Amino acid sequence: MSPDNYLYLSALLFTIGAAGVLLRRNAIVMFMCIELMLNAANLAFVTFSRIHGHLDGQVVAFFTMVVAACEVVIGLAIITMIFRTRRSASVDAANLLKH
């Protein structure tokens, strides 16, 4: 498979993730779409790394995956606490800063 196809796939995945963030109001779905966007960026980094023959893109993708794993833990903990207090995972219902 040519590197162009990987870049097209990366752009498609990023677009799907961005549309999900903009159109969905559920915090868990938005969170999954953000992760999809991060993985699309990682795919682009690895593809450009492969095209140019350097390991820099793969190293950046590795560190991005480490940061994304930390983000998942913290984000899901916050979403779980919001769900426990409000009984809803909707972003519109999460106005906890007002109290």
Swiss-Prot record:
GO terms for biological process: ATP synthesis coupled electron transport. Keywords: Cell membrane, Membrane, NAD, Quinone, Translocase, Transmembrane, Transmembrane helix, Transport. The chain crosses the membrane at residues 3-23, 28-48, 59-79. It is a multi-pass membrane protein. GO terms for cellular component: NADH dehydrogenase complex; plasma membrane. InterPro entries: NADH_UbQ_OxRdtase_chain4L/K, NUOK/Mnh_C1-like. Gene3D superfamilies: 1.10.287.3510. It holds the Pfam family Oxidored_q2. It is found in: Cell membrane. Signal peptide: none annotated. Coiled coil: none annotated. Its EC number is 7.1.1.-. It is an enzyme of class 7 (translocase). It comes from the Bacteria. One of its GO terms (molecular function) is NADH:ubiquinone reductase (non-electrogenic) activity. It catalyses: a quinone + NADH + 5 H(+)(in) = a quinol + NAD(+) + 4 H(+)(out). NDH-1 is composed of 14 different subunits. Subunits NuoA, H, J, K, L, M, N constitute the membrane sector of the complex. Belongs to the complex I subunit 4L family. NCBIfam families: PRK05715.1-2 (NF004320). NDH-1 shuttles electrons from NADH, via FMN and iron-sulfur (Fe-S) centers, to quinones in the respiratory chain. The immediate electron acceptor for the enzyme in this species is believed to be a menaquinone. Couples the redox reaction to proton translocation (for every two electrons transferred, four hydrogen ions are translocated across the cytoplasmic membrane), and thus conserves the redox energy in a proton gradient. This is NADH-quinone oxidoreductase subunit K. It comes from Mycolicibacterium vanbaalenii (strain DSM 7251 / JCM 13017 / BCRC 16820 / KCTC 9966 / NRRL B-24157 / PYR-1).
